[in-house]
Amino acid sequence: MTIKKEIITKRQREVLEIIYDHLITAGFPPSFSELKEKLNISSNQSLLDIFSILEKNNFISREEGSARGIKILKKGYKAISARPLAPVVGFTSAGGFTEAIEEIDAWQPLSKDVETIADDVMIVRVMGNSMINANIEDGDLILFKKTKEFISGDIVLAQTPEGTTVKRFISQNKSPYQFLKPENPKYPIILFTDEMEMTGKMIKKL
């Protein structure tokens, strides 16, 4: 049996390294102009061709319609021998609810124990003290895995029309059947409704 070896050119690797360094230093991917300047090329098409190959081979993903919507995937990090990065996505409340913030503030390297799920994680900075008995304090960075599967007792990232919050998900066989529980007796439970959506499960505090 022949094992197919993954091939990446020097130029493609250089593009990945530039994107990685820019994520670390600036907190977002480089623009087309910045990439062309770093690579010393003038043609947009040349860069698009490189992106197409990298995307086809699952080294990166691209967000349609976004000039900076480039994400390095697990294979891409491996190709440049770099630690995977996770986005830090603003603030969310460990109190009541705060307005959802989707902007990425920065990118942070992941430890080896979570590298295998690098494509499906995000880091959230929390506000408030409703989770202090779970050792989550104001300003802490929490690593969440993006998922749709939860069990009672999970600490979750929950979204509603009012905003987002971090709480413990509780599901039981008596009323109230499902709710979000703070880990601070000064705060009330939040009853689960059809308008709520849990989008992440806590992996650990960073």
Task: Briefly describe each language-model feature range.
Residues D21-G27:
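Short helix-capping/hinge SLiMs at alpha-helix to coil transitions
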Residues V15, S46-L47:
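Helix-turn-helix DNA-binding helix
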Residues T2-K5, D49-I132, T164, K204-K205:
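Short, positionally conserved secondary-structure boundary motifs
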Residues L39-S46:
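Short, basic interhelical loop/turn and adjoining N-cap
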Residues E115-L206:
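Acidic/glycine-rich C-terminal interaction modules and beta/coil loop segments
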Residues E14-D21:
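Pre-recognition alpha-helix immediately N-terminal to the DNA-recognition helix
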Residues K5-Q12:
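Basic, helix-initiating cap at the start of DNA-binding domains
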Residues P29-L39:
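A short alpha-helical element within helix-turn-helix/winged-helix DNA-binding domains
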